């Protein structure tokens, strides 16, 4: 694959992250980001993660995980999903 291309494992890792309880996501991500900016307490962790997720567009990925798959037996196909707000 091309460098920088998305792979199926990227989507599985994303699903794994967003299927966790929110406090666990917050703790896990904030601990990985300590080298970017020192944060103390859940509000500062949340602020840093919100900015990063907003920049990365990750808020839409959480919505995609809520969509029920109607054809679970079909071969996976990578598509763009645009969900209504």
UniProtKB/Swiss-Prot annotation:
It comes from the Viruses. InterPro entries: Herpes_Orf30. Belongs to the herpesviridae UL91 family. This is Uncharacterized gene 30 protein. The lineage of its organism: Viruses, Duplodnaviria, Heunggongvirae, Peploviricota, Herviviricetes. The gene is 30.
């Amino acid at each position: 694959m091309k460098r920088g291309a998305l792979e199926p494992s990227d989507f599985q890792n994303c699903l794994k992250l967003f299927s966790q309880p929110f406090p666990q996501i917050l703790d896990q991500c904030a601990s990985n980001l300590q080298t970017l900016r020192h944060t103390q307490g859940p509000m500062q962790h949340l602020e840093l993660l919100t900015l990063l997720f907003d920049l990365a567009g990750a808020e839409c990925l959480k919505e995609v995980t809520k969509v029920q798959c109607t054809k679970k037996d079909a071969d996976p196909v990578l598509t763009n999903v645009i969900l209504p707000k």
